[in-house]
Regions:
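N-terminal Rossmann-like NAD(P) cofactor-binding module of classical short-chain dehydrogenase/reductase
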Residues: 59-60, 82
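C-terminal capping/lid region of NAD(P)-dependent oxidoreductase domains
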Residues: 130-131, 135-144, 152-172
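Glycine-rich beta-to-alpha transition loops that act as phosphate-gripper elements at the mouths
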Residues: 12-18, 60-65, 141, 145
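Short amphipathic alpha-helix with an adjacent loop that forms part of the alpha/beta core around
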Residues: 40-53
Length: 172
């Protein structure tokens, strides 16, 4: 959210918990939408409405599954869907007619692999992100800290989907 905002994007956050999504507004999101239908309206319809019918230019998708399916239907012509993961448990599958007809790209994003294959550009990217963080533009939100001997509880906390932002395990 913070990076998109810094780059001048109108950030539309999506998720399954309105309580958690409200926090994204503090981080700079312009809007937030629930990914499940609300009053019979899907989030793809809401994205289209918020973008004057055009759709999103870039979609950052760490979820996959149904969210990816809907994302393909609300991406703008020439847009990019960034596949960052599949926390839904269902790996995204794209019928190739969708990007052909709508003229969008699907890009797999693996920061570590990118840095390994192109170390110079990888370092440039890390340096740029670090600079933004050093300047105060990117501030990670840590919702809860656990001691090292509480690591099991930290994992349970994540599995129970209680976190908003990041969980930190600290060594004292």
């Amino acid at each position: 959210v913070q990076l998109g905002k810094k780059m001048g994007a109108k950030v539309i956050a999506t998720g399954t918990s309105e309580e958690k999504l409200k926090k994204t507004m503090d981080w700079g999101a312009s809007h937030y939408l629930l990914t499940h239908k609300k009053d019979g309206v899907s989030f793809r319809e809401e994205v289209k409405e918020l973008t004057d019918g055009k759709g999103a230019d870039v979609i950052y998708d760490p979820v996959g599954g149904d969210v990816f399916d809907e994302s393909m239907r609300c991406i703008n012509w020439g847009g990019r869907i960034l596949i960052v993961g599949f926390t839904s448990g269902r790996i995204p599958i794209a019928p190739v007619n969708m990007p052909l007809i709508k003229g969008f790209s699907i890009i797999g994003v693996r920061a570590g692999e990118y840095g390994r294959r192109d170390p110079v550009r990888g370092k440039e990217n890390v340096d740029a992100i670090k600079k933004l963080a050093d300047e105060g533009h990117l501030k990670p939100y840590i919702c809860r800290k656990f001691k090292l001997d509480e690591a099991k509880e930290a994992i349970q906390f994540m599995y129970q989907r209680k976190l908003v932002g990041k969980v930190a395990v600290v060594m004292d």
